[in-house]
Regions:
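N-terminal, charged/glycine-rich beta-strand/loop interface patches
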Residues: 2-262, 273, 277, 337, ...
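Redox cofactor-anchoring modules in respiratory/redox and cofactor-processing assemblies
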Residues: 247, 277, 282-360, 365
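Short, charged amphipathic alpha-helical segments flanked by flexible coils
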Residues: 270
């Protein structure tokens, strides 16, 4: 496979304003390279519903053009420090989906087709508002492969971090000015989901806590961006379209960037596998808010503004992401103890003659698979493989000094536990863990 990697002097800051049409992988041309320690700044288009109703897209998201990282080689890892993650949209729409039969081949996220003229992934345009607003530009027929079974329009107060679903009348007004309200980046190619004006749920106030649903490094084979995970990726296995893969190929090539993990937000650090030369850092699918599980299948996809800092971790071979969550996002059992608690532990050790008190720090492994049970086993096995700790010891650590948390149904989880500091040192990430959790001084 030829990797589309540019050769030019490393840059301190790269601004990205170009996007994919739903496909990520080694054939994409990368920007950069960015120097090790440099920053990537971008505006991200919404994921999911906008790309879903735009037939030219071959995946469920519209992520940024990938950026090569100086010195990142296959078998390394790249730490992405999320410095800023802000919502740009003033409104969005989302809800529970259903498919329109006859308008896709195997997978409506990947292989859309006009049922009237037979054109695959046709160009399209929006006429009016409502469920039938998207039309094929080849023959003029209505072409949207998706419908809401229950949907809503939600307006966003970005400064005060609150939001509110609106009634049909307000949704129709918003649908008349989708550009002003969605605030898509200039080069985004998706239709705004606001044009559908679906308003089955009104008057519900919700907190805002933005995060990135899809962030990481390129898989080593081209695939739909939304399917770069062990759950949605299963729909690629023996699929009847151009992106069909075997299970072995999926497992070997994906990087699990599509996590929908609500703690992947400003202040978090995502440590990603490098499976192509230069890594190819990409991001998108910002959500304004989401509870654990994303049980509706889709959350509040918004345009956003993101700033990252990159750091290469040499020789850290990963199968999927490691997450260093913000201290306030850690599960309670995995939070480092404060000075008073450590003093109590020291006295407890003295009382029972325990000579050693382990120095450790929190770490989270992302696991993915067709089901939550599969994802949990995957996350636990990744933790054992990377740390060298016995699998059963990981079970015990995650039970009494950690947690298993659902990120997304049907199959993405967080496996968090306190890991011995010498192991974190060996992995080359102890400095990140110490800085993230204040472990060089008194923990808060």
């Amino acid at each position: 496979m030829t990797h589309a990697l540019r050769t030019s002097p490393p840059q301190d800051v790269i601004e990205v304003n170009a996007y994919t049409r739903g496909v990520i992988g080694p054939t994409l041309t990368m920007l950069g390279p960015i120097r090790d320690g440099g920053r990537i700044v971008t505006g991200t288009p919404p994921g999911c519903w906008g790309p879903m109703i735009t037939p030219i897209f071959r995946g469920g998201h519209e992520v940024t053009q990938p950026v090569a990282v100086e010195g990142a080689e296959v078998g390394d890892a790249v730490a992405l420090k999320i410095l800023r993650c802000d919502v740009a949209s003033l409104a969005t729409s989302s809800g529970v989906m259903e498919f329109v039969e006859g308008r896709y081949v195997g997978d409506p996220f990947v292989a859309k087709r006009c049922s009237a003229c037979g054109t695959e992934s046709p160009p399209s345009h929006v006429e009016g508002t409502g469920d039938e607003a998207v039309h094929c530009s080849v023959c003029g027929a209505e072409v949207n492969a998706f419908r809401f079974s229950h949907g809503y329009v939600i307006v966003l107060d970005r400064e005060n971090r609150v939001s509110l679903t609106v009634d049909k009348e307000a949704a129709q007004r918003i649908a008349g000015m989708p550009g002003k309200m969605a605030r898509l980046p200039q080069l985004s190619e998706q239709h705004s989901i606001l044009s559908l004006a679906r308003a089955d749920l009104s008057g519900l106030a919700a907190h805002m806590q933005p995060f990135l649903g899809n962030i990481g490094t390129l898989p080593s084979v081209d695939m739909p961006d939304s399917h770069n995970a062990g759950d949605f990726g299963t729909f690629l296995i023996d699929a009847p379209h151009a992106f069909g893969l075997s299970k072995a190929a999926l497992d070997a090539n994906k990087t699990d960037g599509h996590m929908d993990t609500n703690s992947v937000r400003e202040g978090a650090i995502v440590i990603c596998p490098v499976k192509v030369p230069g890594a190819g850092v990409y991001m998108g699918d910002m959500h304004a808010q989401q509870g654990n599980g994303e049980i509706a299948g889709h959350a509040t996809d918004v345009a956003g503004e993101v700033e990252l800092q990159v750091e290469v971790i040499k020789g850290l071979a990963l199968d999927g992401p490691i997450l260093l969550q913000r201290p306030d996002d850690l599960p309670p059992m995995a939070r480092p103890m404060n000075a008073a608690q450590r003093a109590h532990v020291k006295r407890l050790a003295e009382r029972y003659g325990q000579g050693e008190i382990e120095e450790n720090g929190p770490i989270t492994f992302i696991g993915s698979g067709p089901t939550l049970n599969d994802a949990t086993k995957n996350g636990l096995q990744r933790a054992a493989d990377v740390t060298g700790l016995p699998y059963d010891e990981i079970l015990n650590r995650a039970t009494i000094a950690g947690s298993i948390e659902i990120s997304r149904l049907p199959g993405v989880v967080r496996v968090t536990f306190l890991c011995p500091m010498p192991i974190l040192e060996r992995l080359g990430i102890a400095h990140l863990v110490r800085a993230q959790y204040g472990l060089d001084g008194e923990a808060n």
